[in-house]
Amino acid sequence: MDCFIHIGPSKTGSSSIQAFLTENEQELYKNGICFLRLSKANFFELRFAFSCEYKNTRASQNLGITSENYEEKKNLFKKRIARKISKVKDQGLTRVIISAEGLGALNKTEIQSISKWMYKRFEQISIIPVLRRQDRRALSRYKNIVKNKGHLEQQCLVATDNFDLEYFLKLWMDIFGKKNIKPILFPDSVPESRDLIKDFCAASELSHLSNILKIDGFRRNESIDGRAIEIMRQINLMKPDRHLVPMDKTQRRLNGIIENSFDFPLEKVQPSKKEAMDFYETY
């Protein structure tokens, strides 16, 4: 049985890919393909099952992971994933597709661990990363943390992780082999017109099913007008400690109203020249 693993990283259209897989899950199953996950489509359990240290994040909180039960949860996730894979094999399916953007944050030791574990269960494994221009990815992150995490600074190019694409790809190539890495390009990062879902289908060898799968209409997290983002940021300034607690329903509704007040994103979020120069010096 073969496995295709989409690894993100974040802010590269993962929710769109997962929406496509979820919508077409039954049709894929009829064709011998399993969209594998435990609960939600983002499959964060897989990332935590092979992480080396506990980190308190929104994802870990949603899965009930604490510093006290961390090792117990890791083992539980591995057992549940292993059982699910065994069940898929027993059903006679020939291929598994996984979309887990959290895997994009794994370090070398963690990638080696998941590789060893996966190759005990699959004959062939292909890794699908999505590559996006660093400035576009940083702008997307800025809009996300203003809207959802109470970000205060008017700093458009947010690159807190100093993400290095070459290092990222080399990690996975060194462990899974260069021929098994099938990168695709995010549409806003290349001059030619591209379709993320069609490119994902090509990388995961689903193109032959394009006549029976629903391909269009899966773009999620549409671009938000820059004016809406700035209004949200200024509201955040009224409560500068909001990032310390989860966003409540009232704030979510307010941000939704602000976002919907601009029918089409005419104003883009753009960094200053100095901010752009400082950003590019890190790459």
Give each language-model segment a name.
Residues 1-283:
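Anion-recognition interface
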